[in-house]
Amino acid sequence: MLFAATSWWALGARLCLRFVERGVHAATLSPVGHPLRHVPGAGRAHTYRTLSSLESLEAALEAEQPALIVPCNDQVVFQLHNLYKRRPKWRPLIDASLGDPRAHEVVTRREKLLALAGEVGIPVPETAAVTSEDELATLFDRLGPEAVLKIDGSSAGEGVRIVGSLEEAVRAFRALSRPIGLGTAIKRAVINGDTLSLWEWRHAPPPAVTVQRFVTGHPANAMVACVRGRVVGAVCVEVLSSEGRTGAAVVVRVIDSPPMLEAARLLVERLGLTGFYGLDFVIDGATSVPTLLELNPRCTQLGHLSLPGQGDLGGLFVAEALGLPVGPPPPAIPRDVIGLFPQCVRLGQMDSNRSDIYYDVPSDHPALATELSKPAWPERRLLARLYHRLRAPEYVRMIDARPNKSAVGL
């Protein structure tokens, strides 16, 4: 296996550890200092290089000859799609890892994905591509008074704007539709440690902006493991608190949601998907019906969670995709409310006196836990610290994600 990541999230390391615990040889491809490099027992750590990122990916594939590759953020998926078009020799591996290549354009284009979801009977908000301010005005008149503007390929709440007026919508459209400039790409590479910023500057198409009808309710997420169009395991959660209004979940509750599972099954089957995928929903406040907002074409932060009666998605995927015996799953999480690590630490939400929340700390691997609790490697470097003294990063506040409800006392 080869785990590949460029975003500085912990989720790839947590999932990779599950594979290693099952006896799977898991090499990694990431920037220097990335959490994947701290997974105990992982194989060789290959370096994703800023000035030759696609070449780095191909070199790692040549060296490892993996049975499968697990992309841990959207940009790696985009590079795999690019490699699929350019280098036929890697197509069997990418097919085995991601599924039917005809799905590539659908899973990375929100409007197409939601249109297909609607065709198979999944509740979705009205969504339309927008290419001009005049078009936006017409669409907002129909979709407002509150709407959501998004760009394809964004994640963790970036590239998302919730707007309450046409004026706000126009400002958001201007910001989101502006292509990344060379100066911004260099800043992201040097300060933020974004390995693929220069590659995206050279190769990414102009930002694709969509406008979506706002759905009142509270967020929910699902992550699925699937093999050749069949779901082999899933985790569904409702989000109790998150990093801001559009950011990543911090505290979640595991739920049994047949409608969310059915939506995942329908999409996976229709698109012939393999690998790990995340689905974002809003549970309607009036009807309790989950409405699908988008699909993330890679693993999310739920993949390592071991649930009663199921185990973790990593183990289920290993057994089905590789045909390997995986043995008993890790101990199941003892409570349904989970404080996701390391977000709880970084946002100061760890409280050892709380018996109703299970804090998702990898206690069996203290060195990894210590590393993940630190700021991301780029933020620790002198240049980034000096930069942020001059331009302070935006403060992220944890919010209750459920309207008019207490997030288990948070």
Where would I find each of the regions flagged by the language model?
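Short beta-strand-to-turn element immediately C-terminal to the catalytic PLP-Schiff-base lysine
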Residues: V130, V160-S165, A225-V227, V254
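Conserved metal-phosphate-binding beta-hairpin within the catalytic cores
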Residues: E269-H304
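Phosphate-binding site of ATP-dependent enzymes
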Residues: R174, R178-S242, V254-E262, I283, ...
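ATP-binding N-terminal substructure of ATP-dependent carboxylate-amine bond-forming enzymes
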Residues: M1-D100, D134, E394-Y395, D400-P403, ...
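Glycine-rich phosphate/pyrophosphate-binding beta-alpha loops
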Residues: G157, V239-V252, N296-Q310
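Peripheral (often C-terminal) accessory segments that flank ATP-dependent C-N-forming ligase machineries
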Residues: G315-L410
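Oxyanion-binding "anion nests"
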Residues: R245-V250, I255-L279
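A conserved helix-loop-beta module that forms one wall/lid of the active-site cleft
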Residues: G43, K89-G159, S177-L198
